[in-house]
Regions:
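Low-complexity, Ser/Thr/Pro/Gly-enriched N-terminal "stalk/linker" regions
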Residues: 26-78, 112, 116, 266, ...
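Glycine- and aromatic-rich loop/turn segments at beta-sheet edges
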Residues: 51-73, 121-141, 190-218, 269-289, ...
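Aromatic-rich carbohydrate-recognition surfaces in CAZymes
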Residues: 76-200, 227-230, 234, 319-320, ...
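Extended, well-ordered alpha-helical scaffold segments
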Residues: 31-45, 99-119, 170-189, 236, ...
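Solvent-exposed loop and edge beta-strand segments that line ligand/cofactor-binding
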Residues: 64-84, 107, 138-153, 215-231, ...
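Non-catalytic C-terminal accessory modules of carbohydrate-active enzymes
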Residues: 342-353, 359-365, 372, 376, ...
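Catalytic cores of carbohydrate-active enzymes
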Residues: 33-43, 128-129, 190-204, 232-336, ...
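Bacterial Sec-dependent signal peptides at the C-terminal "C-region" and cleavage site
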Residues: 15, 19-30
Length: 464
């Protein structure tokens, strides 16, 4: 009887295990079916209205056709990194479902984004505005002091390089205005770069792209060596090197290659935190050592002269998604990438959420999900662009399993949004997937198309 009871118990366990396995298989099958349905709905939506981002020239403001991010709020606006990322998505759409005629038509608008900005760029000082709208005028866009506030993010060369690379290396359309692009990069190198550390910094917190990132938001002027900015600048210098090569400008190739290598060294030295296993922004707001004597306790005294400060900056241990841009930019070493992903990205207490990557660690005191505009909220909500950049970085280092999980989170996010609201939003609640603000937003949300192409085993269009 004892053996019979044991046999019955084993049988019950096997049945329970089989039922559990079947339930898991059933749930997995239902999720696969939902993912397929969401991919189909997303593609249908985006393929049908991508031309809604095309805009025609309008007198003085826009000399060339261009791409607007989409939605009523941004209907006639050319934004720096917005139009660049929208174009990365557009390139995927064109590859997926159009022919040569549609691609030729789109190229005029794509190149126009770059050329419009260069039309506003001073060849003498390289100042380039970050935004152009229907009321802009090239002669009225400069601030009184161009070195006291931010300008266009370092991404225009990457936009141009994308188009050149996607069109068989043809850079002739850019040759005449390339000196203006060089002046723009020279402005950054001379006036936005901290000499002691080699890191680039924001002049202030105006329109930095990640509006209220605590590493820059309400910080002293010229104090934030943002990891976001430095990763973008590293890629920008590589893009300049590529474009100069396509134009046969070998001295410029050598210059940008040298600047890129110097920046890579600086970021690895000053922004990598061995303790936490990730990249952070750096704080430049340190008092200089003057060596001048003051009167202390009634006597001349040089404070700290025995061992003055010998470090140029302090690391900012603020858990922001932009630290993962070191994966996207190729700055992290393979060993660093392992720690960044295993110890930081995949931690559900901090960044890894049901609908993507939180833009600020949930453990930071500033974490919140307020639906704000001016500034837009980057202190926790999930954004399509941060999801995409982290995903792209994962693929750079061979984290395909994790990249697939993140892509599926993003597909679920947008698929459910289309089901419930019939449109996409600018940013989202990381736990529920609810759209928080700006319904009808297109722009970089369309980068989910690039994720879908990869998931489905098709050619994936990549940013430069």
């Amino acid at each position: 009887m004892k053996h019979l009871a044991t046999f019955v118990q084993m049988g019950c366990l096997l049945v329970a295990a089989s039922l559990g396995f079947a339930a898991c298989q059933g749930a997995a099958g239902r999720e696969r079916a939902r993912q397929a349905a969401w991919r189909k709905a997303i593609k249908a939506q985006i393929y049908s209205d991508y031309q809604g981002m095309y805009r025609q020239p309008t007198g003085v403001a826009f000399k060339y056709p261009y791409i607007a991010p989409g939605s009523r709020q941004y209907a006639t606006v050319l934004w720096d990194w917005d139009s660049w990322w929208a174009d990365v998505a557009l390139r995927q759409i064109l590859a997926d479902c159009t022919g040569e005629a549609e691609r030729s038509e789109a190229l005029v608008y794509e190149q126009g984004c770059v050329l419009n900005y260069l039309a506003y760029t001073s060849p003498e000082d390289g100042y380039m505005p970050m935004v152009i709208d229907g009321e802009s005028h090239p002669d009225l866009m400069k601030p009184a002091d161009i070195y006291a506030t931010n300008m266009h993010k370092p991404c225009l060369a990457q936009h141009a390089a994308l188009l050149i690379k996607q069109n068989k290396g043809d850079a002739e359309w850019l040759r005449e205005l390339f000196p203006r692009l060089q002046a723009f990069i020279g402005n950054y190198h001379q006036h936005h770069r901290h000499q002691a550390s080699g890191l680039y910094y924001w002049q202030d917190d105006l329109a930095i792209g990640v509006d209220n990132d605590p590493s820059t938001f309400f910080r002293p002027k010229k104090s934030s060596a943002s990891i976001y900015l430095n990763c973008m600048m590293y890629k920008e210098l590589q893009a300049m090197q590529y474009i100069a090569g396509q134009l046969g400008l070998q001295p410029a190739v050598a210059q940008y290659q040298s600047w890129a290598q110097e920046l890579l060294t600086s970021v690895r030295q000053h922004c990598w935190d061995e303790k936490d296993g990730t990249y952070y922004s750096a704080d430049l707001n340190l008092l200089p050592y003057t060596g001048e004597a003051g009167i202390v306790f009634g006597k001349p005294f040089v404070l700290h002269e025995g061992a003055p400060r010998d470090y140029p900056c302090l690391i900012q241990r603020l858990g922001s998604w932009s630290g993962f841009m070191a994966l996207w930019a190729g700055i992290a070493t393979p060993e660093q990438a392992q720690r960044m992903v295993r110890e930081n990205l995949l931690d559900e207490r901090t960044f890894w959420a049901p609908y993507g990557v939180r833009t600020l660690s949930k453990l930071e005191k500033m974490y919140n999900l307020k639906p704000t505009h001016n500034p837009s909220n980057w202190q926790g909500p999930v954004w399509g662009i941060s999801n995409y950049i982290v995903w792209s970085g994962l693929l750079n280092y061979g984290f395909e399993k994790e990249a697939k999980l993140l892509a599926e989170k993003c597909i679920r996010l947008y698929g459910q949004d289309l089901e419930t609201d019939g449109c996409l939003h600018e940013y989202y609640h990381p736990e529920t997937g609810d759209g928080l603000i700006n319904p009808g937003f297109q722009n970089w949300n369309y980068l989910v198309i690039n994720m879908i192409a990869w998931i489905e085993g098709r050619e994936r269009i990549q940013e430069f």
